[in-house]
Amino acid sequence: MIAIVDDDDLMRSALQGMLKAVGLPAQAFASAEEFLKSGQQRQAGCLIADIRMPGMSGLQLQAQLNAEHCRIPIIFITAHGDEKMRMQALRAGAVEFMAKPFNDEALLESVRAALES
């Protein structure tokens, strides 16, 4: 299962639809806190997360998962990223960092690579 964590309803819906259209099961969460409360951390084969969200950010979510020794491949997506943020995310263990709007095929390729890792 691919977990999607994004505070934007339209983005969550679009990502979930895109993944399901190619046969990849996905579950969407409106916040990092909702994802953590769901208990789905260990079932997720990959996590697509926005970096900037109200409450816990994507980077804080990544730190929490690392603290729990939960090594989910994380693909960050953001409309507000810069090179400094990209490097911070990659140093913390993200497998990909994509700026919105992103190419759907590039995202799917990153998801497939993350699932195979």
Briefly describe each language-model feature range.
Residues 53:
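Receiver (REC) domain active-site loop signature in two-component systems and cognate sites
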Residues 30-31, 57-60:
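Acidic catalytic/metal-coordinating carboxylates
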Residues 84, 102-112:
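C-terminal output helix
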Residues 68, 79-81:
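Short, conserved "switch-loop" micro-motifs in signal-transduction and mechanochemical regulators
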Residues 50, 78:
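Active-site residues of response regulator receiver
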Residues 9-27:
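Two-component/phosphorelay signaling modules centered on CheY-like receiver
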Residues 60, 81-96:
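Alpha4 helix (beta4-alpha4-beta5 surface) of REC/receiver domains from two-component response regulators
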Residues 42-48:
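Active-site beta3 strand of CheY-like receiver
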